[in-house]
Amino acid sequence: MSSRSSWSSTEQINRTISSRADDLPPQPRRLEVVSKQATRVTALSTKLEWKIEQFEKLMKLIKNGSNLISRMFSVPDAPTVCWELHVYPNGKRDEDVNNVSFFLRQVGLARGEEPIMTEFQIYALDANNQRVSVCRDTKDFTNQQGRGKFQVSRDKMLGALRSDGTLFLICEVEYFPPGSKISVEPVVDEDVSTEEQEEMPEVIVRANNRSMWEDELFTDCVIHVGNKHIKAHRCILGQNSPVFKSMFSSPNMIEAQKGEIHIEDAKYDSVRAMVEFMYTGATESLESQGNIDEILAIADKYEVLMLKDQCERLIAQTINLKNVTQIAMFSDTYTADYLKSAVIRFLTTHHRVVIKTQDWISLKKSRHELANELLEAVLSTDQDDDDVTSNIPISVSPPPARKRLRRSAK
C-alpha cells in the first residue's frame, strides 16, 4: 500500500508541474547574433641546409678562433632580414678548445631598428639521418648581432658526421617580420574552398599586369634601346620611377610629347628586366641573367629602388676575396648602402687578407677616402658586435665565378 501511495503522489506532483507549465505565457524567442572573428598571425620561417666536407679534419687542423660562415639566407617576403650561421670548428675563444662553437647572426636590419624576437634551432643529420641537436632557443636580434655562443663537444660532433666525414647542418629560423601587425578579421565563409582562399589577389594582379604588358594592350609609349624597342604604359613607368614620372609630367620634354624614350647607356636585356619588374614586382631568373650589376645601374638611374635593393642583395651573396674590392667601389659608385654594408661584414672577417692584395693597394691610391671609410666601419663593428670573427676564415665552397663589375655607369 505504501508503495502505491508513493507512486500516486509522484504522479500527482508531475501533473501539477505540467499543468502550471502549460498555463505560463509563451517565452519570447531569443535573438542571437554571432560575430565570427579570427586573429591572423603569420610568422615567417626560413631554413638553411649546409654541407661542410671533411669536418673531422677541420676540428683537428683549424686554429682556435677561425670560423666558417654560411651564405646569407632569408625570406623573400622580408628581404631586409637576412641570416648567417657561423661555425668555429675548434671553438671561438681559448676556453672553447675541443668544442665546436655556433652563432646565428642577423645581418639585414638597419641600425636603430627594433630587435626581432626569433625562435631558432640548429641541428645536424648523422649517417642514419637522425637529428643531433646543437641548440634550440628564442632570442632577440638586432643588426649585425650574433647570438650564442652554443658549444658542442668534439666527441658529440664526431657522432653527428655522415659516413664520408661531412657535417650536414640545418638551421631553422622563425620570426615576425619588422612592422608586422596582428589583426582581427572576419572569418572567411566556410563554403569558400581552401584553394580559393589561398589564391592571393596580388598574384592575380601581377599575372594580369604581365599579360597586359606582353600583349602590348593599350600601350602608349615606347622605350628604344639600340635597334630594339619595348612598348609600355606611361602610368606604370611613372608610378614606379620618379624619373619617368618627371619626363611624362613635363609638357616640353619629347618623352611627354611623343611618348618615346631613348636609352643609350644600357643594354636591352637590362632595361627589359627593369620594365618587367615595374609590371610584376619580379624579374624572371634574375640570379641567372649574369648582368645583375647592369640591372642595378639602370635601376639606380631611374630610381626603381625596390629592384635596386634586390640586386644589391644578390650581389652581396657573391662577395669573395677576389672581388670584394671591386664590389666595394661599385657599391660606392651607385650609393648601394646594403651592398656596402655586406662588404664591411666581409671585411670584418677577412680584412687581414684583403688589405695585402694588389686590388686593395690600388684602392688606397685611387680612392683612399673609400678605403678609410671601410676600415673605420670594420673597426667600429669589431668594437660593437658581440660576435666578432677573427683570424683568417676558411672558405669550404668558394662562390661561383662571376664577371667583373663595372666601376661606373656611362
UniProtKB/Swiss-Prot annotation:
One of its GO terms (cellular component) is nucleus. Residues 219-287 form the BTB domain. Residues 45-173 form the MATH domain. Pfam families: BTB, MATH_2. Residues 401-410 have a biased composition (Basic residues). GO terms for biological process: proteasome-mediated ubiquitin-dependent protein catabolic process; protein ubiquitination; regulation of proteolysis. Keywords: Ubl conjugation pathway. GO terms for molecular function: ubiquitin protein ligase binding. SUPFAM superfamilies: POZ domain (SSF54695), TRAF domain-like (SSF49599). Residues 1-19 have a biased composition (Polar residues). InterPro entries: BTB/POZ_dom, MATH/TRAF_dom, SKP1/BTB/POZ_sf, TRAF-like. SMART domains: BTB, MATH. Probable substrate-specific adapter of an E3 ubiquitin-protein ligase complex which mediates the ubiquitination and subsequent proteasomal degradation of target proteins. Interacts with cul-3. This is BTB and MATH domain-containing protein 42.
